[in-house]
């Protein structure tokens, strides 16, 4: 539990730019994706509340049933906020935005609403492709929110392989 508190504090420091970071290339951020995992995999996107902070990371993992079930390399991070007129305002935080991203955001909003989520201000993490894996959690209980893994430690290498290879190595 203390590790979760430390991870939350680090995420706060990184999101508020209290700690400069240039090593995001080696981090895998794992998110709980219970009800949305099928949509996430199909559309190669994960969304989260815009107000949640996060540290720099290049890889995203989807967690369900005591295991990371899919991982992908992030290609774009885009926020979408509904203004007072009901229109979406986009901000590209990383990468570039294509029309396909806007279409996927609209699909995510509809999908999220059908599950009871209030989709007015979200951050969308687009990955090149999610690859199936089975990276089992070794600690008791589900992670509370986000977990960050240093892939150089997990894979015991300084050279991160392509995502498909990594997914196989983690399984």
Residue ranges and their predicted role:
Residues 1-171:
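Charged, terminal alpha-helix-loop-beta segments
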């Amino acid at each position: 539990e203390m590790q979760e508190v430390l991870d939350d504090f680090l995420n706060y420091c990184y999101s508020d730019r209290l700690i400069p970071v240039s090593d995001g290339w080696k981090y895998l951020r794992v998110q709980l994706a219970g009800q949305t995992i099928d949509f996430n995999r199909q559309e190669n996107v994960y969304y989260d509340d815009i107000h949640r902070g996060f540290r720099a990371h290049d890889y995203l993992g989807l967690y369900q049933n005591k295991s990371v079930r899919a991982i992908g390399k992030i290609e774009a991070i885009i926020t979408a906020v509904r203004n007072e007129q009901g229109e979406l305002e986009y901000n590209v935080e990383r990468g570039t935005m294509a029309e396909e991203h806007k279409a996927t955001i609209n699909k995510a909003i509809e999908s999220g609403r059908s599950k009871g989520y209030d989709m007015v201000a979200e951050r969308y993490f687009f990955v090149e492709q999610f690859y199936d894996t089975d990276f089992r959690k070794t600690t008791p209980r589900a992670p509370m929110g986000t977990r960050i893994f240093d892939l150089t430690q997990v894979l015991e290498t300084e050279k991160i392989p392509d995502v498909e290879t990594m997914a196989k190595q983690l399984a």
